[in-house]
UniProtKB/Swiss-Prot annotation:
<dbReference type="Pfam" id="PF04617">
    <property type="entry name" value="Hox9_act"/>
</dbReference>
<keyword id="KW-0656">Proto-oncogene</keyword>
<dbReference type="GO" id="GO:0035115">
    <property type="term" value="P:embryonic forelimb morphogenesis"/>
</dbReference>
<dbReference type="GO" id="GO:0033574">
    <property type="term" value="P:response to testosterone"/>
</dbReference>
<dbReference type="GO" id="GO:0005737">
    <property type="term" value="C:cytoplasm"/>
</dbReference>
<protein>
    <recommendedName>
        <fullName>Homeobox protein Hox-A9</fullName>
    </recommendedName>
</protein>
<dbReference type="InterPro" id="IPR001356">
    <property type="entry name" value="HD"/>
</dbReference>
<keyword id="KW-0488">Methylation</keyword>
<dbReference type="GO" id="GO:0007283">
    <property type="term" value="P:spermatogenesis"/>
</dbReference>
<feature type="region of interest" description="Disordered">
    <location>
        <begin position="155"/>
        <end position="198"/>
    </location>
</feature>
<dbReference type="GO" id="GO:0048704">
    <property type="term" value="P:embryonic skeletal system morphogenesis"/>
</dbReference>
<dbReference type="InterPro" id="IPR050803">
    <property type="entry name" value="Abd-B_homeobox_TF"/>
</dbReference>
<dbReference type="GO" id="GO:0008584">
    <property type="term" value="P:male gonad development"/>
</dbReference>
<dbReference type="GO" id="GO:0030850">
    <property type="term" value="P:prostate gland development"/>
</dbReference>
<dbReference type="InterPro" id="IPR017112">
    <property type="entry name" value="HXA9/HXB9/HXC9"/>
</dbReference>
<dbReference type="GO" id="GO:0006351">
    <property type="term" value="P:DNA-templated transcription"/>
</dbReference>
<keyword id="KW-0217">Developmental protein</keyword>
């Protein structure tokens, strides 16, 4: 309201007395400080009260002497243009401490080795699960500690296989030893070849082991074949009982002997 009243008086004086006289009156009547506008000062930056002060050490200026050092001042003494300049800094938000300044002026690499029990920040990848005591990676690959708890560490995977696989290996070895003992100790029951449910991978051969005849048995069978190439059922039973053979064995031997004799006679006819 004071500014509009002063402008109104200025226009009234210029209309009545003229422009030159109005300028002289306005200079004497209205001092520079009465309009409520503070004089423009040098461009000094002040920190915004909502942001925490920067904790990094001051380094050499990059842009020359045009950048003035930052002074702590109240929010009422900063012009609107300076506030507008502050809003163009997108990285002024509070951040996690990345590096801590050492007393000798160097930055310590605190992000490489996080302390045990530290909290992980959301959205930031972590190289080691926090809350676990870091173990040295210089352990030999064969010296793997047993897994007493469910917590996992990097050294568990440096031994060649995950802990779950190492737990399964002893049980599998014991199972294979038991199978070997069972196979060597007792004979398995014979598998029925007519059973379609039997697995052909584990089924044994159904062919019986070849049982060669003794010299005595062969000689007696040859004598009987010379007398009669075909045996009756009663005579086959008697021969099998005398030679300690089954009737089927006697029958098969006579069939094979007849086929052999037929082949010999055929070859002899070709030679003649």
């Amino acid at each position: 309201m004071a500014t509009t009243g002063a402008l109104g008086n200025y226009y009234v004086d210029s209309f009545l007395l003229g422009a030159d006289a109005a300028d002289e009156l306005s200079v004497g009547r209205y001092a520079p400080g009465t309009l409520g506008q503070p004089p423009r000062q040098a461009a000094t930056l002040a920190e915004h009260p909502d942001f925490s002060p920067c904790s990094f050490q001051s380094k050499a200026t990059v842009f020359g002497a045009s950048w003035n050092p930052v002074h702590a001042a109240g929010a009422n003494a900063v012009p609107a243009a300076v506030y507008h300049h502050h809003h163009h800094h997108p990285y002024v938000h509070p951040q996690a401490p990345v590096a801590a300044a050492a007393p000798d002026g160097r930055y310590m690499r605190s992000w490489l080795e996080p302390t045990p029990g530290a909290l992980s920040f959301a959205g930031l990848p972590s190289s080691r699960p926090y809350g676990i005591k870091p173990e040295p990676l210089s352990a030999r690959r064969g010296d793997c500690p047993t897994l007493d708890t469910h917590t996992l560490s990097l050294t568990d995977y440096a031994c060649g296989s995950p802990p779950v696989d190492r737990e399964k290996q002893p049980s599998e070895g014991a199972f294979s030893e038991n199978n070997a003992e069972n196979e060597s100790g007792g004979d398995k029951p014979p598998i029925d070849p007519n059973n379609p449910a039997a697995n052909w991978l584990h089924a044994r051969s159904t062919r019986k082991k070849r049982c060669p005849y003794t010299k005595h048995q062969t000689l007696e069978l040859e004598k009987e074949f010379l007398f009669n190439m075909y045996l009756t059922r009663d005579r086959r039973y008697e021969v099998a009982r005398l030679l300690n053979l089954t009737e089927r064995q006697v029958k098969i031997w006579f069939q094979n002997r007849r086929m052999k004799m037929k082949k010999i006679n055929k070859d002899r006819a070709k030679d003649e």
